[in-house]
Design a protein with these regions (language model features):
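Conserved NAD(P)+-binding/catalytic subdomain of aldehyde/semialdehyde dehydrogenases
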Residues: 172-259
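Conserved small-residue-rich beta-alpha loop and adjacent elements
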Residues: 96-166
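A glycine- and small/hydrophobic-rich beta-loop-beta segment
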Residues: 254, 262-338
Length: 420
């Protein structure tokens, strides 16, 4: 049984009716008035009065000049790892042809990239330019022909953050648009005068973006509906309290709704992490947000065994899961529900956020029970095909006709009988 030594508040069930109605109204405006509505929302929410929503090549080139040599080198290094892993993953997704379950019946599948995608890169509290690399790079590796991206402008400037623009360009984005929010999701779902709709939209955003993705799903594909960021750390008493505290606060600083959880087999260690968190908050630049998040949703529990921690992790299905224990390899086979796994004290969760090569766009709110994060396969379709010899067609037709009659579908049976 887990003993809680630092308790989180229960996340209240938010009344989403107003949110749903607001987002539905925005979507309706974009569908009805197109670019005119987009520009109005751009000005209302971001103070942006730019005439052209599409970012020009000149703007992108100017963004490169704003970056220092080290900043550009860092972006290129991170992109290298993300691209290398995406390309390696692509090689694991193979076509299948001429599989024959019985004589004369030939089955297979093709791996086909979607034609177009939109990569939504958040602005908000922090310009998450790393997200541009995480979204567009696997799309490029998948072979998507038209990769678009959008991000809100830096308020009052009319321009997207320079690092974000450069990251989009490095990752191979074909079209960049200066807009965000629910209105951006609607535009790329239904299209406007200046924006052609896409096949799939990927990327995180605020609750308005998330609700818009939910409402537009079906008209457009999405990666998943994401909630606040979360990390679960499993640690024994031999871990570093300072390291664990830093990892918990790295998650907490995302926003006031982020959640950091520690499960440990050592109560004294858990208490030392609480102390280390307090010390770190004294010097953290983002302490205001991190403090509110940690006080509200941070949690530390003491487990009787690491197996109990594993059981909890599988039920919770965290976005990020850290194994900060002496023998992490013993736990890995037992873990089945997580967005991304970080093995051992050397492997900080923030490394995956930026540059190790795995993707940081991951499922939250227990969605890791049924899906993984964004990867090259997000942009690929597995499409089956089949062919038959005349002999096989005649042989299988009576079977199909009998089954069709059993379901009361005489038209199906007739179509099968024509092949006898």
């Amino acid at each position: 049984m887990i003993k809680i030594i630092k308790e989180a508040q229960v996340r209240s069930e938010e009344d989403n009716r107003n949110l749903r109605e607001t987002v539905a109204g925005i979507i309706g405006e974009i569908r009805g008035r197109g670019d005119a509505a987009l520009k109005e929302y751009n000005e209302k929410f971001d103070g942006c009065t730019r005439e052209s929503l599409r970012v020009s090549r000149e703007e992108i080139d100017a963004a490169y000049k704003e970056l220092g040599e080290q900043e550009l080198a860092d972006l290129k290094a991170a992109h290298h790892n993300i691209e290398a892993f995406a390309n390696a993953q692509r090689q694991t997704v193979k076509p299948l042809d001429n599989f024959s379950p019985e004589p004369g019946v030939f089955l297979g599948h093709r791996i086909i990239p979607v034609e177009s995608c939109c990569c939504y890169v958040p602005g908000g509290n922090y310009p998450l330019y790393s997200t541009a690399l995480m979204l567009a790079t696997p799309a490029k590796a998948a072979g998507v022909k038209r990769i678009t991206a959008c991000s809100p402008v830096v308020r009052g400037t009319g321009h997207i953050n320079a690092r974000t623009l450069v990251a989009m360009d490095l990752a191979g984005v074909d079209e960049i648009y200066a807009l965000g929010g629910a209105q951006a999701i609607a535009a790329f779902s239904y299209g406007t005068e200046s924006i052609k709709p896409v096949d799939i939209i990927v990327g995180p955003g605020n609750r308005f973006v998330t609700e818009a993705k939910r409402q537009c799903y079906g008209q457009v594909g999405i990666d998943f509906v994401a909630g606040p960021s979360e990390v679960l750390v499993i640690a024994d008493g031999k871990a570093s309290a300072k390291v664990v505290a830093a990892d918990l606060l790295a998650q907490s600083e995302h926003d006031v709704n982020a959640k950091g959880i520690l499960l440990t087999t050592d109560e004294a260690f858990g208490k030392s992490v609480i102390e280390a968190v307090e010390e770190e908050l004294k010097i953290l630049d983002t302490a205001k947000i991190a403090r509110q998040s940690w006080d509200t949703f941070g949690e530390i529990g003491v487990v009787d065994s690491l197996d109990e921690a594993v059981q909890y992790a599988n039920e919770y299905a965290p976005e990020h899961l850290e194994l900060n224990v002496e023998d992490p390899d013993a736990l890995i086979p037992k873990l089945v529900n997580y967005g991304s796994l970080f093995i051992g004290q050397n492997t900080a969760e923030v490394f995956g956020d930026y540059a190790s090569g795995t993707n940081h766009t991951l499922p939250t709110l227990r969605a890791a029970r049924y899906t993984g994060g964004v990867w090259v396969g997000t942009f690929l379709k597995t499409c089956t095909h089949q062919s038959m010899t005349p002999e096989a067609s005649a042989r299988i037709a009576p079977l199909v006709a009998r089954m069709a009659h059993g379901e009361g579908l005489s038209g199906h049976a007739a179509a099968a009988d024509e092949r006898k």
